[in-house]
């Protein structure tokens, strides 16, 4: 997941958009109740609109190519990322992704997950960014809109999603460049087809997609630059096939007052004489609101912080849902993975390549069967750090030297130490670390002593 640093970038874009419209010279004249309803509606609908924009961009192709594929087809990542990779911030170097954007409006899609010798889990998300299911056993699954009525073949497991739009992210564990061919073989065994094709047993060929130059955009930039009418009418349209949850009835009744909801028609006229200026003013004020909400969801692990429950299955925590969407779509629930971060040493000073540090483990992170862990270093720009070894993380697959007492020390330094076995290269300037713990043992985690970072 792209972390909170991306939220800062996103909201900086909001501020630049706002300043371009002369917002400072304008006084906000929108009545307080209307302003609150607009803000609540925006925060509520933001993940839905961003999911749609992301799908539109990711499926904007006639055939499957690197990073894109038509609806209901696999988008298989094929390469291990390195320091040259700049497409997304805080890239994951532990797993290879296989994604699908689904249209479930006509019939279920059958996803056949093969047997593997490694961590390989399929996260299925609905249009509102909630995790509908996590698939981790081999076999055929029917990814199905919840209101679909029909019979499935024997042996096929039904997976209900409450919306027509859905997204799956399959994460397959990778143990370095030499392991890529094994991951490619697993990807080749993954199968996806409509239920009708699965039942007919014919040789299925997916339909050709389409390409539109106008849809070749960065999704977050696209959504943040929408006018109020564009944003809310897109949300209204999407809510017809991707209905709000039953427990959302209170906020749906509230935002219906400004014509936001399934089948509604929003007009910018309610914003007065300068709707775009008033809109930009509102977006600017949302930034401190969401940032202020962030801290209450933080969980501590020693000097590390991570986003805790209900991440990935948000319920009525709409502010949290919007915050995480801005920081990066596809967040796992905590039982699947947690992502602790630190940017300081054990004295609270920012980490910088001007110094060398010892990352000290008393014990490695506790994981359940099939789980794994890693620690990755990122520069101040949130990208991987170039180094002569092309080593970007240390993990449970690293051949680390263990101290006599069973502890492990990792050297964090720009320059290589005499023994490079336990060296994690860092940047010249400031840097930070992300720990990824997949399938964590949450009970043991509460008693676990997280690694400390000590200035050498």
Question: Where does each model-flagged region fall?
Answer:
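Bacterial N-terminal signal peptides
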Residues: 8-17
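A compositional/structural signature for long, glycine/proline-rich flexible linkers
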Residues: 25-456
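Sec/Tat signal peptide C-region and signal peptidase I cleavage site
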Residues: 20-24
């Amino acid at each position: 997941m792209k972390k909170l640093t991306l939220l800062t970038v996103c909201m900086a874009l909001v501020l630049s958009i706002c300043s371009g419209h002369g917002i400072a010279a304008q006084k906000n004249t929108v009545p307080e109740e209307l302003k609150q309803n607009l803000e609540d509606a925006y925060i509520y609908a933001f993940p839905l609109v961003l999911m749609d924009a992301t799908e539109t961009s990711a499926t904007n192709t006639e055939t499957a190519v690197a990073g894109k594929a038509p609806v209901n087809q696999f988008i298989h990542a094929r390469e291990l990322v390195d320091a040259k990779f700049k497409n997304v911030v805080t890239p994951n170097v532990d797993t290879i992704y296989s994604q699908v954007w689904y249209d479930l409006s006509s019939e279920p899609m059958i996803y056949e997950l093969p047997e593997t010798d490694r961590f390989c889990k399929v996260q299925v998300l609905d249009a509102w960014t909630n995790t509908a299911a996590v698939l981790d056993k081999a076999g055929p699954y029917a990814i199905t809109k919840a209101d679909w009525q029909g019979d499935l073949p024997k042996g096929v497991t039904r997976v209900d999603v409450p919306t027509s739009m859905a997204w799956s992210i399959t994460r397959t564990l990778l143990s370095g460049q030499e392991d890529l061919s094994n991951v490619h073989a697993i990807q080749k065994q993954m199968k996806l087809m409509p239920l009708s094709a699965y039942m007919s047993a014919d040789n299925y060929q997916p339909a050709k997609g389409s390409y539109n130059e106008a849809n070749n955009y960065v999704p977050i930039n696209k959504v943040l630059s929408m006018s109020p009418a564009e944003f809310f009418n897109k949300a209204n349209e999407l809510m017809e096939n991707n209905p709000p949850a039953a427990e959302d009835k209170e906020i749906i009744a509230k935002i219906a007052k400004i014509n936001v909801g399934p089948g509604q028609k929003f007009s910018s006229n309610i914003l007065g004489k300068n709707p775009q200026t008033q809109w930009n003013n509102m977006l600017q004020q949302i930034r401190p609101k969401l940032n202020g909400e962030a801290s209450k969801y933080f969980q501590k692990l020693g000097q590390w912080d991570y986003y805790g429950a209900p991440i990935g299955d948000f319920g009525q925590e709409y502010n949290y849902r919007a915050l995480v969407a801005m920081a990066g779509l596809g967040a796992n629930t905590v039982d699947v993975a947690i992502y602790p971060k630190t940017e300081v040493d054990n004295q609270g000073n920012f980490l910088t390549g001007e110094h060398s540090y010892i990352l000290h483990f008393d014990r490695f992170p506790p994981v359940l069967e099939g789980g794994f862990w890693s620690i990755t270093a990122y520069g101040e720009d949130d990208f991987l750090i170039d180094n002569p070894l092309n080593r970007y993380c240390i993990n449970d697959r690293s051949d680390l030297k263990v101290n006599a007492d069973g502890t492990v020390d990792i050297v964090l330094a720009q320059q290589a130490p005499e023994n490079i076995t336990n060296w994690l290269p860092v940047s010249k300037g400031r840097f930070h670390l992300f720990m990824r713990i997949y399938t964590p043992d949450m009970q043991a985690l509460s008693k676990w002593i997280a690694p400390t970072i000590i200035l050498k």
